[in-house]
Amino acid sequence: MFSYMFWNNKGGTGKTSLAFQVICRYAYRNLGQRILAIDVCPQANLSELLLGGLTNGGSKNLLERQGLVPRCSIGGYFQLRLPSPFAVPDFSVRDFLTRPAEYNSNIPENIDLFAGDPLLELQANAINTLANTQIPGTDTWVTVIDWIKDAIEQVRDQYDIVFIDANPSFSIYTQIALSTAHRIILPVMADDSSRRAIQNAFSLIYGLKLPSDIYSKYAFATKLKQADRSLPKVHIIAKNRITQYMGPASAYAAVLRSIEKDVSNLIKLEPSIFTFNNVTDGVVEIRDFQTTGVVAFARGCPFYKQPFGKLHIDGHRVQVKEDYRDKCIDAIDTLVDKL
């Protein structure tokens, strides 16, 4: 069972919308495989999309799942672990999983969902405290970091691939998610804050270019390595929301080139943290989804199932052009081809 995580240390990069389309497209192209989507984000936007989106009751369906006993979400599972943080309790992970296709007919039936939950923010302080508790003979931090790993270990033979979407922060629940991932997909935008965010991401995950050596002892990478655990590798840099205005001479292109240059320098210095040896092999350009994306996400619909022509969305009449929709499908396929 292999796992990919969509993450960057910045919001607004289109991470969740990209994750939604990639997960659905991968599942559709690989109907013989079982896919598990894990939403480790308090906003739970990926879960809402998979469960129906704005116009098809995604929020209502998610609240219904969170209202079950036990609470059918990642927050419900963490709630189970809080009284038993250092020993795996007797439980079935199936109690916390959802089949999105039962709520949203647009979603392939080979996808299961570990839904997101706003409880994560409330639980974060308690989880942090437990992870930093000193108990002789117990590595409490690693034991807590393994919570998601403990859960999916039960169904390891039942899934072929796991996709994880996580909050842009580097909170404890994000670290729990990162420790579970084998590969990272880093979405970036054509702005300087994305460049800083990707630099921050490499510092936070791999402990690179820390401002002082005093931080290295407490770094995520240091703690995982001390436990003889491997770090996830960067697999794809996704240049997201590329438009026709981002030609070679544009300011946007200059920012994206600077990001590529930073990554290229890191490949030379730390080749072991990448799955590619040349930056061009790891970069994927994703065109801006425009109206097609707005409509698809409102309906909780993958692009390949998105009808074209005039559609009604929340009382408004909008038009989706067939060629635009097809270009969106092609853009997602360029990323899925690399998985």
Stretches found by the model and what they are:
Residues S84-I107, D112-I164, F170:
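Cytosolic-facing regulatory segments adjacent to core modules
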Residues Q43, S47-D112:
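Phosphate-binding loop that captures ATP/GTP phosphates
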Residues G14-T16, G137-V144, S194-I198, Y324-V336:
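Phosphate/oxyanion-binding active-site loops and adjacent basic polyanion-contact surfaces
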Residues F2-Y4, R29-L31, V142-L269:
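Conserved catalytic-core segment of NTP-binding enzymes
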Residues F2-P42:
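Walker A/P-loop phosphate-binding motif and the immediately C-terminal alpha-helix
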Residues L36-C41, D112-G116, I164-D165, V234-N240:
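Extended hydrophobic secondary-structure segments that form protein cores and membrane-embedded regions
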Residues Y218-L339:
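C-terminal lobe/tail of nucleotide-utilizing enzymes
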